[in-house]
Structure formats: C-alpha cells, structure tokens
C-alpha cells in the first residue's frame, strides 16, 4: 500500500506491527511509537516533527531522504535499516541508538544530543555534527573523514581505531586525541 503526501498527527501506537506500507513525502507530527515493528516498509522524503520513537523493530525497512526534527529516538538499532539509508537529524535526542555497519556519508546530525549511542564500522564521511553533544557515545572502526564536529561537547574519538582525515573538532576534543597519542600540550 502506498501513502502519498499525507499529514499524520497526534497518534500513539504501541506493541503493534505495520507491514508492506510505503510512505512518500508525508509529514508525521507528534507521533509516539513504542515497541513498534515495521516489516517491509519504506519511508521516502518524509518529515518527522516532535515525534517520540522508542524500541523499534525493523525488518526489510528503508529510510530515504527523511528528516527528523525535535524528535526522541530511543532503543533503535539503525543497523537494521536497508541500504540506501539517507536522513537528517536536527535538534534530536538519541538514547541507546546503534549505528552499525551503515553507509551514512554526508548525513546531518545538527544540534543533537547523543547519550549511550554507538557508531561502529560506519561510513560517516563528510557528515555534519555541528552543535551536537555526546555523552557516553563511542565511535569504533568508523570513517569520520571530512566530518564537521564544530561546537560539539563531550566528543571523544580514538584515532587508533577510527579514520579521522581532515575533520573539524573543538579544541577540547583535539587535546583528548593528542593525549591518547602521548602528546602533551603545555604552555
């Protein structure tokens, strides 16, 4: 079933499953999804605004050119999203979200708050994290080349297990990287 150019607002769905539905150019506002299962679904060019999305199960799920603004994403394993996967997150809270083995080049994560998140074996080249906060969030074996981490807080990147060619980082994060490398900056 295809759903095109619909505005869906103020819904609370929990402990349910949606199968075989494709959304195109839809807007979701103030939607709450808890313990929801998406099977063989696709969202393309959709916007999610002020939504709460917790503990999703994703099977044969596609997310293409979607935007999340002012949303809470919690307990989501983004590794279950099929390729291609393109999205932007603006002013979102992410808790216990795993980005594993994904190709997310040129993704946008502006002014987001990451808590207990993991980026592992993920290609994030040329992604923009400007203004984001990181709390207990790890990057492991990921390509961060040409990423912009300007004005971020709490960023801690291990250069021994990540590719960090030409990245923009705040001074605090740069000092942490130098310390890991055994370089002491004094003055």
Curated annotation (Swiss-Prot):
Keyword Repeat: no
Name of one Pfam family that matches: Pentapeptide
Signal peptide coordinates: none
GO biological process terms on file: response to antibiotic
Keyword list, A-Z: Antibiotic resistance, Plasmid
PANTHER family: BTB_POZ DOMAIN-CONTAINING PROTEIN KCTD9
Function according to Swiss-Prot or TrEMBL: Together with proteins McbE and McbF this protein causes immunity to the peptide antibiotic microcin B17 (MccB17), which inhibits DNA replication in Enterobacteriaceae by induction of the SOS repair system. McbG alone can provide some protection.
Name of the molecule in the record: Protein McbG
Species of origin: Escherichia coli
């Amino acid at each position: 079933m295809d759903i095109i150019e619909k505005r869906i607002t103020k819904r609370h769905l929990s402990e349910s499953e949606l199968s075989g539905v494709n959304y195109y150019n839809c807007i979701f506002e103030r939607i709450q999804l808890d313990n929801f299962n998406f099977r063989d679904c696709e969202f393309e060019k959709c916007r999610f605004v002020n939504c709460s999305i917790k503990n999703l199960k994703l099977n044969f799920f596609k997310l293409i050119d979607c935007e999340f603004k002012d949303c809470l994403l919690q307990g989501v394993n983004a590794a279950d999203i099929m390729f291609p996967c393109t999205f932007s997150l603006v002013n979102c809270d992410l808790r216990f979200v795993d980005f594993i083995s994904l190709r997310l080049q040129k993704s946008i994560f502006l002014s987001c708050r990451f808590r207990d998140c993991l980026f592992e074996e993920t290609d994030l080249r040329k992604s923009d994290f400007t203004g984001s906060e990181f709390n207990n969030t790890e990057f492991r074996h990921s390509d961060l080349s040409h990423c912009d981490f300007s004005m971020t807080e709490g960023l801690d990147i291990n250069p021994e297990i990540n590719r960090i060619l030409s990245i923009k980082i705040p001074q605090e994060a740069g000092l942490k990287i130098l310390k890991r490398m055994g370089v002491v900056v004094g003055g």
